[in-house]
Amino acid sequence: MAEEPVVIGDPAPRTRKWPIVVGVVVVVLIAAGAGFWVWHEQPSFCAAICHTPMDEYLETYEQEAGTAGVDKWGNEVANTNAMLAVSHKAQGKDCMACHVPTLSEQMSEGMNWVTGNYVYPLEERDTEMLTEARGVDADEFCLNESCHNLTRDDLIKATSDMEFNPHQPQHGEIECSECHKAHRASVMYCTQCHSEAEVPEGWLTVAEANKLSTAA
């Protein structure tokens, strides 16, 4: 059969390009979202978005382990290992390992930041406050398979050679965060009554910690 003649000036057949455009936009959005999510889990994200209240916390996290440093208030710390932010970083943990976000918590904190409804430096949070939004027991915050795979009894045995065993609940069970601090030097709780209790390197007695907290 003879081919139909092409008339000069006729428009070329139109192709539908919108599926390609939509596909490209979707790919770009997915890539951008994935990149943002990765950045969201980095310590630098905290200070970049919430610059004012978070700078000091990022600075404590970024310090080298086992050296002299400073806490979130700028006070000298004899050994940065006394701050959980530093010792956890040395074990490959980042901010999100402890500060596990929930949508309701993030929305609330975001509104407080936008409106300026927060104290500065930020109010210290204990393990109960850190787990409240997730409905997790305070003990489970630290004692779990991905962090410290131990029980309370294991902890008692681990420090049984100390004259005043900080994990022995003879005066009632206390939260881990009563002694172990993230962005300031940890505190030997036993010194509240026993001034002769052994204080780990870089840690503070209760009296020393109270003095710094009051000054801040």
UniProtKB/Swiss-Prot annotation:
The keyword Transmembrane helix applies. GO terms for cellular component: plasma membrane. InterPro entries: Multihaem_cyt_sf (IPR036280), Tetrahaem_cytochrome (IPR012286). PROSITE patterns: MULTIHEME_CYTC. The chain crosses the membrane at residues 18-38. One of its GO terms (molecular function) is metal ion binding. The keyword Metal-binding applies. Belongs to the multiheme cytochrome c family. This is Cytochrome c-type protein Cgr1.
